[in-house]
């Protein structure tokens, strides 16, 4: 924010682009500058080598196996060294391939990350390992996504889970067994779909410190730019999560 004060501690958001895109493209999909001024946080839109992230076996760094997990961890650590960041409030979000990479970061670096918000990107079909620590997840997915399908599918014969299967995986990882009624919290998330098309499924762990949440965007496609209302609500959701 323009009034950045090194004596204060700020939340930090790492926002990851999709396959063939870059940081500038992600900033267009999920703008943060206005919200950073309003809520006081720091953010970064990095660009992956070859316009992709090596997230899972299904998506998406096919040509060269860059260690993007280690790179992004080092980027977060660098930001914490150079800027006044609250280490209890470090968040990763991303679209499509960036959503896959958000899950990879949660798996590999749960010690560093507070919560993730993936759009239209899931994790492994069969997880090679579980996160070391539970961390909150907000998964956002359109039912008419023809690229990363709501019901799951495969990319070059490499399977990825459905949105609901992926949600269940993380609900179990996080030991979120307590259902929270969110039926009245419908959201107008998709600018290209009329009305409040997004419904919420929410579970928490027994003491309410970890949340696993699914936003089902009925009629939403793969690239569904969120409304200003939805962007703000996502930021508020992030900042409600803390280590």
Per-region residue spans from a language model:
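Acidic beta-to-alpha connecting loop that harbors the catalytic carboxylate
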Residues: 48, 143-146, 153-154, 218-221
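Serine-hydrolase catalytic machinery in alpha/beta-hydrolase-like enzymes
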Residues: 7-91, 101-104, 108, 228
């Amino acid at each position: 924010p323009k009034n950045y004060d090194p004596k204060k501690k700020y939340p930090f958001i790492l926002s990851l682009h999709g396959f063939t895109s870059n940081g500038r493209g992600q900033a267009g999909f999920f703008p943060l500058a206005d919200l950073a001024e309003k809520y006081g946080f720091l953010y970064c839109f990095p660009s992956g080598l070859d316009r992709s992230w090596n997230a899972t076996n299904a998506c998406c760094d096919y040509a060269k196996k860059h260690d993007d997990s280690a790179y992004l961890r080092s980027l977060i650590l660098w930001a914490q060294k150079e800027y006044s960041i609250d280490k209890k409030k470090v968040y990763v979000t991303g679209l499509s391939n960036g959503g896959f990479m958000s899950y990879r970061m949660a798996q590999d670096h749960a010690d560093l990350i507070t919560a993730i918000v993936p759009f239209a990107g899931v994790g492994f079909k069969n997880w090679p390992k579980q996160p070391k620590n539970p961390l909150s997840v907000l998964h956002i997915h359109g039912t008419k996504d023809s690229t990363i399908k709501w019901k799951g599918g495969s990319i070059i014969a490499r399977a990825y889970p459905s949105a609901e299967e992926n949600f269940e995986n993380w609900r179990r990882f996080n030991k979120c067994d307590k259902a929270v009624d969110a039926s009245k919290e419908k959201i107008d998330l998709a600018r290209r779909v009329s009305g409040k098309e997004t419904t919420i499924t929410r579970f928490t762990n027994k003491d309410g410190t970890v949340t696993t949440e699914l936003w089902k965007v009925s009629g939403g496609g793969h690239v569904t730019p969120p409304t200003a209302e939805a962007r703000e609500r996502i930021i508020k959701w992030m900042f409600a999560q803390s280590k």
